[in-house]
Regions:
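Phosphate-binding site recognition
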Residues: 1-201
Length: 201
């Protein structure tokens, strides 16, 4: 079954992946489907998915190393104590360097709250490590003002790096139009499937 209601967004992400080194910013209110969209996009790709929280920076680095360990199937990475984000991003760049891969940082603003210098750190990582190694970077967040300030604004260190951005809105109206154009039985099936997904969100 098609991924209901976000086919255009999926198409945009796939186009960015073809660039080899896309930098995508996705933002919008909570529970509009940002993470669901991203996970649908990366499910059949070489991807590193990291969900930031309000924990300390050291703990974030430790969990990020765990993501790298599981994705690269290198258990030794879990035993390393990383103190520099650049070293972690280098692991992403070095993994299958000739293949396209995706790095997702979900709830990006939490990392900025923990370390206000993180946008500068990420800018350096993108320019010096990630950009030329077939990495597509996705920054996602629900704190809209912080996403605009730290990922999109002119005075952000990340300004000028993005290749695409998405402001995701609720899709009720779009889905209503979609379902109204379907045969009745197909519409019922899709509404039932959509309801189950909403419950999981």
């Amino acid at each position: 079954m098609d991924f209901i209601g976000r086919t255009s967004e999926l198409a945009t992400l796939n186009t960015e992946l073809e660039r080899g080194s896309g930098f995508v910013v996705i933002y919008g209110r909570r529970r509009v489907g940002k993470t669901t969209l991203i996970k649908e996009f990366i499910k059949d790709k070489q991807a590193f998915y990291f969900l930031a929280t309000t924990e300390s920076e050291a703990q974030s680095m430790k969990r990020f190393a765990g993501v790298l360990s599981r994705t690269t199937k290198n258990p030794m990475l879990c035993k390393v104590t990383f103190t520099d984000w650049l070293d972690l991003f280098q692991v992403v760049a070095d993994d299958h360097p000739d293949e396209k891969k995706v790095l997702v940082i979900d709830e990006f603003p939490y990392l900025v709250k923990t370390n206000p210098d993180f946008p500068s750190i990420l800018q350096n990582a993108w320019d010096e490590v990630l950009k030329d190694h077939n990495v597509m970077l996705i920054l996602c967040g629900s704190l809209i003002s912080m996403m605009k300030k730290h990922a999109l604004a002119y005075d952000s260190p990340l300004y000028g790096r993005r290749t695409a951005q998405m402001c995701m809105l609720r899709r009720t109206c779009r889905l209503s139009r979609l379902w109204s154009s379907m045969p009745l039985q197909a519409a019922y099936r899709n509404i039932w499937s959509f309801s189950r997904r909403m419950n999981r969100w």
